Amino acid sequence: MASLHDLWFILVAVLFVGFFFLEGFDFGVGMATRFLGHNELERRVLINTIGPFWDANEVWLLTGAGAIFAAFPNWYATMLSGYYIPFVIVLLALMGRGVAFEFRGKVDHLKWVKVWDWVVFFGSLIPPFVLGVLFTTLFRGMPIDADMNIHAHVSDYINVYSILGGVTVTLLCFQHGLMFITLRTIGDLQNRARKMAQKIMGVVFVAVLAFAALSAYQTDMFTRRGEITIPLAVLIVICFMLAAVFIRKKKDGWTFGMTGAGLALTVGMIFISLFPRVMVSSLHSAYDLTVANASSGDYSLKVMSIAALTLLPFVIGSQIWSYYVFRKRVSHKEPMTY
């Protein structure tokens, strides 16, 4: 029978899977503004496709971080101290992007609009890349000592494997965002988004395969829990193969579902390969942080479980409702907030 700290690890995993699925297409749309939007009006249409959703989608990241803080304080302390600068970079990028969303539609000066457009682009590019780097180093292993402190060098953060992880996550988000655009726009903009998604499909596929191959060499992803992770890896490949088929048939909804499933399964596979560890020590396996030695006490976990079970359905329900209310496609002929 699963213990409370096991269940909270699963909850944290679900929150981050949800974050990358939902915020992933937000990031992708933000990146697409520089490549797909040919003028200010088209970029405005693109931003308004995610206008009603982006702030609620970010809540999944905040909730995930909050769950780690409450349920696994040692994990939170070790990770935040060891990854302090990268997390600050991510937060600054997210804050800048949020400010840009709000301000670009409220200024008439073209130069300022261009400035905010670049902030939207980099604020959408930096977080998935940095988070991809961090996740790969998380299960590749960091020099964590017996006191749960990280003593890392630059090469522990920046190496071929971590950069490939960052690039792969960024490409997955970009493609996911392009498919979201096809569901939320009409006409020429929709067609260009579909064509661009089709063009980069091969690049994304190669990146995913390269990441899987290097993961097999650099980590124990496919040996520790191979009976689960290997079928998941095959399923991820199938998702992207189906996405390639659906996009040729212009079945945008199915393609979006497949790209989202591939992204979500990739994140889920990382958490499965970690369990019961939460951070891997490259110094000695005895120094690994696990769900047992990094978690809060049983009483705290019980109280938080009751609160989570009570509130989570309302949060998920309200977000589903918002997607239903704002399901209409965005056009330059419609009033736009951003």
Swiss-Prot record:
Membrane association type: Multi-pass membrane protein
InterPro entries to which the protein is assigned, alphabetical: Cyt-d_oxidase_su2
Main location: membrane
Known catalytic reactions: 2 a ubiquinol + O2(in) + 4 H(+)(in) = 2 a ubiquinone + 2 H2O(in) + 4 H(+)(out)
Enzyme class: translocase
Record flagged with keyword Cell membrane: yes
MF terms (GO), sorted A to Z: electron transfer activity; metal ion binding; oxidoreductase activity, acting on diphenols and related substances as donors, oxygen as acceptor
One GO CC term on file: cytochrome complex
Protein localization: Cell membrane
EC number: 7.1.1.7
One Pfam family hit: Cyt_bd_oxida_II
Membrane spanning residue stretches: 7-27, 50-70, 75-95, 119-139, 163-183, 196-216, 227-247, 256-276, 306-326
UniProt keyword terms in alphabetical order: Cell membrane, Electron transport, Heme, Iron, Membrane, Metal-binding, Oxidoreductase, Translocase, Transmembrane, Transmembrane helix, Transport
Cofactor note: Binds 1 protoheme IX center (heme b595) per heterodimer, in conjunction with CydA.
An individual GO BP term: aerobic electron transport chain
Source domain of life: Bacteria
Cofactor(s) of this protein: heme b; heme d cis-diol
Family: Belongs to the cytochrome ubiquinol oxidase subunit 2 family.
Subunit structure: Heterodimer of subunits I and II.
PANTHER family registered for this protein in UniProt: CYTOCHROME BD-I UBIQUINOL OXIDASE SUBUNIT 2, CYTOCHROME BD2 SUBUNIT II
Name of this chain's protein: Cytochrome bd ubiquinol oxidase subunit 2
Source organism (scientific name): Bacillus subtilis (strain 168)
